[in-house]
Amino acid sequence: MARPKRTVKKREKKNVPVGLAHIQATFNNTIVTFTDTRGNTISWASAGQSGFKGSRKSTPFAAQMAAEQAAKKAQENGMRTVGIYVKGPGSGREAAMRAINAAGFKVAFIRDITPIPHNGCRPPKRRRV
């Protein structure tokens, strides 16, 4: 018996000219997410998703590649102007911002939204290398 053909719905491209780029740079990875102004995700990429594994995920080059990948997908959805939010202490912060700028976006603003505790949780113990 022949199985009926299943039609796959093609994901429609949203036309979002203005959006936000969220860069989360941790010590182990960098995640770049492009959203519309209301916070709905349009595209995202991370250093791990870009093919880097282990300690190479935390490098500035990996962050640059992730930002380029996410920016390309966002531009396909019509994004031209972005505001950048940066969170975290990682080494990929500046590299990701530079990659977004080089991708041809008009950067409206750059804001650091790294959460700072008012003496909340106890931090991890100091590393002895």
Curated annotation (Swiss-Prot):
Keywords: Ribonucleoprotein, Ribosomal protein, RNA-binding, rRNA-binding. GO terms for biological process: translation. InterPro entries: Ribosomal_uS11, Ribosomal_uS11_bac-type, Ribosomal_uS11_CS, Ribosomal_uS11_sf. GO terms for cellular component: ribonucleoprotein complex; ribosome. Part of the 30S ribosomal subunit. Interacts with proteins S7 and S18. Binds to IF-3. Located on the platform of the 30S subunit, it bridges several disparate RNA helices of the 16S rRNA. Forms part of the Shine-Dalgarno cleft in the 70S ribosome. Belongs to the universal ribosomal protein uS11 family. This is Small ribosomal subunit protein uS11. It comes from Nitratidesulfovibrio vulgaris (strain ATCC 29579 / DSM 644 / CCUG 34227 / NCIMB 8303 / VKM B-1760 / Hildenborough). The gene is rpsK.
